[in-house]
Regions:
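Helix C-cap/helix->beta junction micro-motif
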Residues: 41, 151, 211-212, 391, ...
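AMP-binding (ANL) adenylation modules
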Residues: 54, 257, 361-364, 400-403
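Short hydrophobic/aromatic beta-strand micro-patches
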Residues: 271, 373-375, 412-414
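Conserved glycine-rich beta-strand-loop-beta hairpin in the small C-terminal domain of fold type I
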Residues: 311-314, 318, 331-346, 350, ...
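PLP-dependent enzyme catalytic core of the Aspartate aminotransferase-like
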Residues: 2, 92, 96, 100-102, ...
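N-terminal small-domain helix-loop-helix segment of the aminotransferase-like
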Residues: 3-10, 17-115, 321-328, 434-436
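Conserved core segment of the aminotransferase class I/II
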Residues: 246-336, 432
Length: 436
């Protein structure tokens, strides 16, 4: 059976990797394996395994950072809860695009949104005695569960696929009624499935968080990237949906990596509800020196993790937020091509025997965006990941994300420009022919 990549090379590096199962490898492990096969074979892959921005960072952020470095900030420790202009910029950004009021004191940069999630779980899981468990609404970013394990926090999880709409309430109650959940973590839009929670679902999550005094950790890594609506105009509807409309128990975790293409600078944003920030817990002081939530979060939590986010990166992001908040820079328009890529790539897959796994938001077709999910008849997602390596195509198994849809894989569109579509099509045609 002829394949684009020499089978002997693929097998050699799979064996050398020592992985028990290629299809269950972590994103970073798979990324290293694919790179090794690429180098040895001389054949470039269609790289869909890792969510890496496919565009250059905005020039205004680059210039802001260069200017700050030229002014000498590189020799100075930054405020570890953020420079004042960035804190104010984050608060304005949340108001302009979510229509939610947060105070600058509750806004802080983190070393990427990944650190933001880690910090949020660390503090939320220790707010009350006996309520240290994290509930993950899956599928989700695999590393978040690793973070919970490292923190020593127990967790529960469920795949939301069969619990959309009103069914979500009963499912959440089965966990919350146990009385040991400290926080609920989910991403919206969702990584890996690209489902987007509806206002009905966010209202359920928010209302139950208030009822059971649980914190909603809302991972907005793909901020404004549900391209079915235009969320690009500051201070004007439609506003990006958020659980913050339905509860005061929220922490918003906003990435700069995808929406702003600033992945390399490792700077994310956290916005804490003013009510939560000024609240108290009975178990924070032993861990963070104070039972006051906001004080514990910053002076006990953030300070323990870092002496602050890169000083110049803070200035670059602050400059960018100023442009975004004023309407000078349209960040949604800058990344809208991801949606067009997804639309074309989905069709290339479905034209060649694949089907979309997560395909609906309740009764509405899923948006075209940064990720999509596919399956092929007769293969599990675990097997499909390995089989596609012989065709120079890489993705990750949904099994690694907490999904119960074990037949599927996640594909990221960011590194597949339009110039690669003919090659992707040819490889998928060959794959389908070889598996008839």
């Amino acid at each position: 059976m002829k394949t684009p990549i020499d089978p002997d090379i693929v097998k050699k590096f799979i064996t050398a990797s020592g992985l028990k199962s290629v299809g269950l490898a972590s994103i970073r492990e798979l990324n290293r394996l694919v790179t090794n096969i690429e180098v040895a074979s001389g054949v470039s892959f269609i790289r869909m395994e890792m969510g890496i921005p496919g565009f250059d960072p905005p020039q205004i952020a680059v210039e802001g950072e260069i200017e700050a470095l030229q002014q000498g900030v590189g020799s100075k420790y930054p405020p570890f809860d953020g420079i004042p202009e960035l804190k104010a910029g984050i608060a304005s950004f949340v108001k302009n695009f979510l229509n939610i009021n947060v105070a600058p004191e509750g806004c802080l940069p983190t070393v990427g949104s990944m650190q933001g999630c880690y910090l949020a779980m660390m503090v939320a899981g220790r707010r009350f005695e006996g309520r240290n468990k994290i509930l993950f609404i899956d599928p989700g970013f695999p590393v978040n569960k690793i973070q919970a394990r490292v923190l020593g926090l127990p967790f529960e999880s469920f795949d939301v696929y069969d619990f959309r709409g009103a069914r979500l309430e009963d499912k959440l109650r089965t966990y919350l009624e146990q009385g040991d959940i400290g926080a609920i973590l989910y991403s919206n839009p969702n990584n890996p499935s690209w489902i987007c929670f509806t206002d009905k679902e966010l209202e359920i999550i928010g209302r139950l968080c208030t009822r059971y005094d649980v914190i909603a950790l809302e991972d907005l890594a793909y901020f404004g990237m549900d391209f079915r609506k235009d969320y690009s105009q500051p201070g004007r509807p439609p506003y990006i949906p958020s659980v913050a409309n339905f509860t005061d128990n929220y922490i918003l975790l906003i990435s700069s990596s995808k929406s702003f293409s600033l992945a390399g600078q490792r700077i994310g944003m956290t916005a804490i509800s003013p009510v939560l920030f000024n609240s108290a817990g009975d178990n924070l002081e032993p861990w963070f020196g104070s039972n006051r939530f906001g004080y514990a979060y910053i002076f006990g939590g953030m300070y323990a993790l870092s002496s602050g986010v890169c000083h110049s990166a803070q200035h670059g992001l602050a400059r960018l937020l100023e442009a975004v908040n004023s309407g000078q820079y349209n960040f949604v328009e800058a990344v809208q091509e991801y949606g067009e890529r997804a639309r074309v790539m989905k069709k290339l897959f479905t034209d060649n025997g694949f089907r979309i796994v997560y395909d609906l938001d309740e009764d509405e077709p899923l948006a075209d965006g940064f990720y999509f999910t596919v399956a092929y008849p007769g293969l599990t997602g675990e097997a499909l990941v390995e089989e596609l390596l012989y065709y120079g195509i890489s993705g990750i198994s949904l099994a690694t994300t907490g999904s119960k849809r074990l037949e599927g894989i996640r594909a990221c569109v960011s590194l597949t420009g339009k110039e690669l579509f003919p090659e992707l099509k040819a490889r998928l045609v060959q794959f389908n022919q070889n598996h008839q």
